[in-house]
């Protein structure tokens, strides 16, 4: 069995920065499981099923990537899936501080390792928050999200065609 890793997140919505991390992870590891957090206590623009569908559209041409939803502690999901490595994208130093705290907690809880990856330079400025903000004003999303995600955002914000 090859090395499987998990790339977890809320992905509300998924964007090209997320896809960049997945593509690069898929070149390094045998299998990448994109784990979409259901997060019922957090306000989300899209429900979990919609976010899974968007990510599936983004990775449909990458054979060693699958997208799953989870609604539990990440380490419990990982145990069920037989995965012991997490991949996380880190854009800024402030991201790293938070991610390091989570990585240390996951290690203490279940002995899982975390691999940090920087997004490629052309995607480092993109966040789901920025994508939602631009989309809410019907702005140009072409360089931020997959066409399917763009379509869903335009529908959500009544932007027309």
UniProtKB/Swiss-Prot annotation:
Asked if Nucleotidyltransferase is a keyword of the record, the answer is yes
The yes or no answer to whether the keyword Magnesium is present is yes
Q: Where in the cell is it found?
A: Cytoplasm
Supply the SUPFAM superfamilies for this chain: Nucleotidylyl transferase
GO CC annotations, alphabetized: cytoplasm
Coarsely, its chief localization is cytoplasm
Q: What class of enzyme is it?
A: transferase
User: Which Gene Ontology terms cover its molecular function?
Assistant: ATP binding; pantetheine-phosphate adenylyltransferase activity
Reported EC number(s) for this entry are 2.7.7.3
- Tell me the subunit arrangement: Homohexamer.
Q: Which NCBIfam families match?
A: coaD_prev_kdtB, cyt_tran_rel
The job of this chain, per UniProt, is described as: Reversibly transfers an adenylyl group from ATP to 4'-phosphopantetheine, yielding dephospho-CoA (dPCoA) and pyrophosphate.
What protein name is recorded for this chain? Answer: Phosphopantetheine adenylyltransferase
List the source organism: Aquifex aeolicus (strain VF5)
Query: What is the gene called?
Result: coaD
């Amino acid at each position: 069995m090859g090395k499987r890793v998990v790339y977890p997140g809320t992905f509300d919505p998924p964007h090209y920065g997320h896809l960049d991390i997945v593509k690069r992870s898929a070149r390094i590891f045998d299998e990448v499981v994109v784990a979409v957090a259901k997060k019922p206590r957090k306000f989300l623009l899209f429900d979990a099923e919609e976010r899974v569908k968007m990510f599936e559209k983004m990775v449909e041409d990458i054979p060693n990537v699958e997208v799953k939803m989870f609604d539990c502690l990440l380490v419990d999901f990982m145990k069920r899936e037989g995965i012991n490595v997490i991949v996380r994208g880190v854009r800024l130093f402030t991201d790293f501080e938070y991610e390091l705290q989570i990585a240390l907690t996951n290690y203490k809880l279940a002995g899982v390792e975390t691999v940090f990856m920087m997004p490629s330079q052309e995607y480092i400025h993109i966040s789901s928050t920025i994508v939602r903000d631009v989309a809410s004003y019907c702005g140009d999303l072409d360089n931020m999200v997959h066409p399917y995600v763009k379509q869903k955002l335009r529908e959500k914000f009544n932007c027309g065609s």
